[in-house]
Amino acid sequence: MPVVGIKQVVDAELEGRSNTFNFRKNPSQVTTQGLWFDLALSPGNPVPKYWFGTPLQATVISQSLDGGLFHGSDVSPSKKYLRDTTFSSTSATGLPMPLVLMDYLMYYPLIDEGTTDEQFMDNTNTLTRYTDGEGVQVMAVSVAGRTGGQSFFINYTNQDGVSGRISQNVIENTSAALGVVVTSATATNANSCLFIPLQDGDTGVRSIESVTMLGTDVGLFSLVLVKPLVSTVLLEQTAPVKKDYLTESSNLPEIKPDAFLNLVCLPNGALNATGILIDMKVIWSD
C-alpha cells in the first residue's frame, strides 16, 4: 500500500524498506551572490550532467541513462518516497543558501542567443514522468557565456495540453559561469526568476514549442523541464540542516521510477572550492 501515515513509515523502516545515500558536490565555477546555480553541472558525486546534445531536440533525462543523485533501483509496483534530507557545507562563503531538490525530466539543448529568428523545438521525445505537465517548470541554464541583458520568451504547451501559450519576457543576467540560471538575479526586478514565468493561469508545461530572442548575444543556454520536490535553506557551516518530511510537511514527496534527482542553489557568494554535502533517506511501500 502507499506510504501515507506514521504507521506506514514506521513499518517501512522496521521491515527494511529504506535506504540512505550520501553525496558531495564540488562546484568549480565562481558563482555570484543572488544568481541561481544548477549543481547538476558541478563535479563530485554524482558526476556532472552537462546539458548538451542535438540542438533544440527534446531529450529525456533519467537516472539509468544520466545518473543524478542515486536513489536506488526501481521498486515498482511499490512507490518510493523521500523520507528525510540533510545538507551541510565545507565553507561559510556561500551561506545562507536556499536549495531546491528537483526531478529533472527533459531538456532542449543549445538555444542560440545569436539570432532573433524563432527557434523551433523537436518534440519527437515527450515527458516520461509527470506526463500531464502539472507542476512542471522551465529553467534556462547557461552552457556558454554571454554579455547579458537580452530578453527572450518561450512558446509552450501547458498542463491541459493547450499549445501556443506564451511565457512572460525574461531578461538574461551577465554571469559567465556555466550552470548559472540565466534568468535569475534577485537584486534586479526584471530578471529575478529561477523558473520562466508562464502565461497567466498556467500551472505547468508539457513541452516547449519554440524560443524567440528579442535581441542577440553570443551565448548558449539549454531549457530544462523540472518538477520541484522539496526546498530548504542552509544557514551556516557549523549547523547542517535536516528536514524530516514526515513531521515537517503534509506528505512525503514521491520519487518516480528512474527519476533524475539533482539540486539548484542560490548562493550568497562564490562556491568554487566549496563542498556541498547531501544525505538522503528513501523508503518504499510494501
Regions found by a protein language model. Give the residues of each.
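Polar, enzyme-active/binding microenvironments
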Residues: M1-D286
